[in-house]
Amino acid sequence: MILDKIKKPNDIHKIPLAEFPQLAEEIRSFLIESVSRTGGHLASNLGVVELTLALHNVLDFPDDKLIWDVGHQAYTHKILTGRKGEFETLRKEGGLSGFPKRGESNCDSFDAGHSSDSISAGLGYVHARDLLGENYHVVSVIGDGALTGGMAYEALNNAAELETNFIIVLNDNNMSISPNVGGMSNYLSAIRTAEAYTGMKMSLNKAVKKIPRVGTAMVDAVRRTKSSIKQLFIPGMLFENMGLTYLGPVDGHNMRQMMRLFNEAKRVKGPVVVHVLTEKGRGYEPARQNPDMFHGIGPFDIKTGKPTQKKVCPGYTDVFADALCQVAAEEEKLVAITAAMPDGTGLKKFSQRFPDRFFDVGIAEEHAVSFAAGLALGGVVPVVAIYSSFLQRAVDQMLHDVCMQKLHVIFAVDRAGLVGADGETHQGNFDISYLSMMPGMTVMAPKNDWELKEMLRFAVKADGPVAIRYPRGNAYQGLQEYQTAVEMGKSEVLHSGCKVAVLALGSMVEICAEVCSELQKEGIDSTFVNVRFVKPLDTALLDQLARNHSLVVTVEENVQNGGFGQQVCGYMEEHHPGIQVLPVAIPDRFVPHGGVDSLRVQLGLSANAIAEKIKKISSSYSEGIRE
């Protein structure tokens, strides 16, 4: 196999161009086989095989810098830089990350995971290169979806002032060029991408600008005249008008054409956008037909394309989706907003039932929140469904546009807590901290599927901003015998004991049910509390616990700094200084990829680890807290 010849970075330079098509097919076969066993992002990676091969053919690693926006499409890049043998460990604890990681390879130039930042990072590299007098190429690869994020345009606007080379590859996998203008676009593209044309254009502009007083004006006038015609045919005029050179569009599966274009782009003295048309899922029919399903998928059967792991029960996202539709049927003023993730957040079902009340704003979390603020002021009830790790991109908008105005906006914070395989960039470990600091924000977390539905109904009737955080994965269906009404700022006591109180939040209620059972075996009859509300804090309950408890244990799947436990510590220190508080939370560090259960063991959040901590403290009391 040709693929077996790739052992380390730049080995691709030894492969004859005639063998590249076969190499592309071998890489596709390898990706399908490998991801079918481990799970991962498949459709996007199948779409960029030729694009990645073409880039590696014209670049040298690790000297040149290749920055992937989001980064989930970098599997072929990992293969070509000598990591093929590690793919059996993809997204597993201690194994290969599903995203570029600088700590994994010096060929990964930027740790990725979130959207629309690649051009900014690339521009930073370019300025650092020029300031230090170094000589290497910088390439940022960004998808058409990521271009819906405003940060990308901020960077493009800033890059327009550059006078040195910076290559931006627009990976367009939506095939947005209409057939009726495709012929003209390709014709004009062929003219504009010829070496003679680009060289002549740069030289002519430079020469004309030297004409005293009128040079720059002449160049601007010519640009305006030709743009009035070209804008009718070429989508790239958006970039040209911003001051960037535009090359393309080019077939993203024709490697020779792309190599010619990339080599031409390397000659441009300034920022250049190379527009590449690719097809998601190429080479595997199930992924090509259903790219959304194969965006991120678990292990699957190659023949059928269907997951090999069946759902045992509905996930929290499914429960939220059904509950939202039920509430929307009763509340005509309720609307739903997503930032380009209707499937991931469960809003696809809502969009089908209530299309006029559904808004997909693109990858633009900041806009989504301010947009929701306007909707709330206009008299409707917006529900903003966003992953925890992505919502943090809109902290200022939540604080300034929503909380400051005390607006009734509901935040459905999906993937809160540990998410597992996607690692540091996707763990939802910070939302309690950043949401709790906002004046007027109500923050809730359900213990099970029933409580999520009830909290959503409560949020719709509440005043001001409300956030409901819930985890990834199957919805906990235990403790159904406890179904007390949700009241503002009130916890739910599941068992009354003495001496030790365990206050569990959201997903940790399931874990702490085991903890309390284990403590009972050791003679420790602990009070077990389903916290429900992070904010407002249930101070009445804390006052009550202080009367007959020596130890209060808080358990949450959030970083300790700024978390629920610290809030309880602060209150108890001020009002009940004699009570010891043990906050159990995620330490002050980023959590890598791995299985959620395994990560909990590492972080001291497993039932056994929590029980051991409590037993250790209990045995240290001279008078004891055992019965």
Where are these regions (language model features)?
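N-terminal amphipathic, basic-rich helices that act as targeting or association modules
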Residues: M1-L80, L244-M259, V272-T278
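Long, well-ordered, tryptophan-enriched scaffold segments
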Residues: L3, N174-F320
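Cofactor-binding active-site loop characterized by glycine-rich and histidine/acidic residues
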Residues: H41-L162, Y316, K333-L334, T338-A339, ...
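Non-catalytic terminal/interface segments that mediate subunit docking, oligomerization
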Residues: K65, G270, T278-L391, Q397-L407, ...
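A glycine-rich helix N-cap at a beta->alpha junction
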Residues: E86-L96, E161-M175, A196-G199, C403-R415
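Structural signature of the thiamine diphosphate
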Residues: M218-P286, H408-V413, I432-E481, A607-E627
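Glycine-/acidic-rich phosphate or pyrophosphate-binding loops and their flanking alpha/beta elements
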Residues: R260-N263, H295-G296, G305, G315-E330, ...
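Peripheral docking tails and interdomain loops at the edges
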Residues: P299-K303, P307-V312, G420-D422, T442, ...
